[in-house]
A protein has these predicted regions:
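N-terminal helical cap/lid subdomain that shapes the substrate entry/recognition surface
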Residues: 1-96, 106-109, 118, 124
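Asp-based, Mg2+/Mn2+-dependent phosphohydrolase catalytic module
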Residues: 1-6, 85-212
Length: 212
């Protein structure tokens, strides 16, 4: 049988991003709840994360990235969703080949490896030179996996716009993980048919076979 791959997103898939968004609120001097509510409103109207900053007059947010990154210090065990390691091990035990390919700074790949995620393929958008939802991101991801048939790859992510729709367009099996701000706020277009919709990575492990 042809090898099947499970390719995982990072933010709100393996990593709970509450800490990084809370640090942004602190940097801007905004109550955390207020900042997170504004982020949710931006998502609900179809905006990008960067659209939250002008709400608080922070047009200079790019100049503040370094300060926030210093405070964040990269991924830690405390940032992992509780099911992340279980799912990684469970998918491997079921014979799936594993990749992690996501929109992230390049340094995140080494941080994930340090946390025990030894995926066969690990690539971040900054190092790839292209980001989701660009189709070239998914083409490059397939190339890094050795160019399997797209239908042999399940791409797992929380965002409809960045993960589900473009992975369907690439011919992959789209798996929508409904958690995190984007996962619970965004809605699927009526025409979109992901291969699988799950609420957790534990559910993913139990139901991944249904993606095919």
């Amino acid at each position: 049988m042809t090898d099947r791959w499970v390719c995982l997103d990072v933010g709100e898939t393996l990593i709970d991003e509450t800490r990084i968004w809370s640090l942004w609120a602190d940097e801007l001097g905004v109550p955390r709840l207020t900042f997170l509510a504004a982020l949710g409103a931006v998502i609900a109207r179809g905006g990008e994360h960067r659209d939250v900053f002008p709400i608080f007059g922070a047009d200079d947010w790019r100049q503040r990235l370094l300060a926030v990154e210093r405070a964040y210090g990269g991924f830690t065990d405390a940032d992992l969703y509780p099911d992340a390691h279980r799912a990684f091990a469970g998918l491997r035990q079921r014979g799936y080949r594993l990749a992690i390919v996501a929109n992230q700074p390049e340094a995140r790949a080494e941080q994930l490896r340090a946390l025990g995620f030894d995926a066969e393929v690990m690539a971040m958008s900054d190092g790839m030179g292209v980001s989701k939802p660009d189709s070239a991101f998914f083409d490059q991801a397939l190339g890094l996996m050795g160019s399997p048939e797209p239908a042999a790859v399940a791409y797992v992510g929380d965002r409809v716009d960045n993960d589900v729709l473009p992975s369907i367009a690439a011919g992959m099996r789209a798996v929508w993980l409904r958690r995190g701000p984007w996962g619970v706020i965004q809605r699927l277009p009526e025409s979109a048919r992901p291969a699988l919709v799950v609420e957790s990575l534990d559910e993913l492990v139990e139901r991944i076979g249904e993606a095919w």
